[in-house]
Amino acid sequence: MKTKENFLQEYDIIDFHTHPFLEPKYDISFHKEYLRLTQEDTFRIMKNLGVSKICGSMLSADADVDGGDVWGHIKTLNRKALEMKRYYGDFYEVGMHIHPDYVQESCAEMEYMRKRGVKLIGELVPRRFNYDYTHKGLDDILELAGEYGMVVSFHSMDDASMDAMVERHKNTTFVAAHPLEKTTLLRHIERMKNNENCYLDLSGTGLFRFGMLRRLINEVGSERVLFGSDYPICSPSMYVGAIILDETLTEREKAWILSGNAKRLLNITQK
């Protein structure tokens, strides 16, 4: 008889969209007083679900910008992420922050982080840092991301600005976060059909709508969809179950979504 652990370990899962932390200040879960999560809990929870690697950026739960020093705040988040990489090792893939008001600083930071093995930018969350995807300062940053082969994860916002950003930078790989409701999902699909450099991760709202994943795969293919949970905001067990237990998916489709696409985009080699 298969146990839960044996069953889950059959799958190699990479959670492309998380916001892990080493200190309570950076725990952005909504009900943290009832969870009291630690960095050890993150590792245990994910490993028990068959997740072999997590990806993503750090965010601050206390304030969007510490003391008004936007760039200082961003740099602190990036250094904390590198510290977390030293703690977790291969379990964690760093996601770094940039800011279009600080183009030179962002480009220099990308070079610094790239030399330390960082391949992921984002999740970009403009509302936390008071900009949007129409900001002209993003152009040089996103072009450099393409040159460096870095993947850009971005929070779903208004469709027109997402369209323009992705279309302006054809040599840069983008992964939109959150399918959301049907209207937004359909626009994600349209954007992905029009731009081969655009993918979608399944974190946040949307995956619980039965049939949305089948629609997404039929329209753009399982090779364009990545597993993500948005941990610790969302419960990763719900997302693991939504993929593994979905009888409308083939095993091959599950494999692409759960880890195959993340491995390919981030050039990850593991089991």
Regions found by a protein language model. Give the residues of each.
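Mid-to-C-terminal alpha-helical segments outside catalytic/metal-binding sites
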Residues: 1-20, 25-53, 222-224, 237-271
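Hydrophobic faces of well-ordered beta-strands that scaffold small-molecule active sites
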Residues: 14-18, 54-56, 92-98, 121-123, ...
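Conserved, mostly hydrophobic/aromatic
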Residues: 17, 46, 81, 113, ...
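Divalent metal-dependent hydrolysis catalytic cores, especially in the metallo-beta-lactamase
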Residues: 18-19, 40-69, 92-97, 119-123
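Active-site environment of divalent metal-dependent phosphoester hydrolases
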Residues: 21-23, 61-65, 100-104, 128-129, ...
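Short, flexible/disordered intra-domain loops and linkers
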Residues: 26-35, 62-75
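Active-site gating/metal-coordination segments in enzymes
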Residues: 69-151, 207
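Catalytic pocket-lining loop regions of alpha/beta-barrel enzymes
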Residues: 119, 134-226
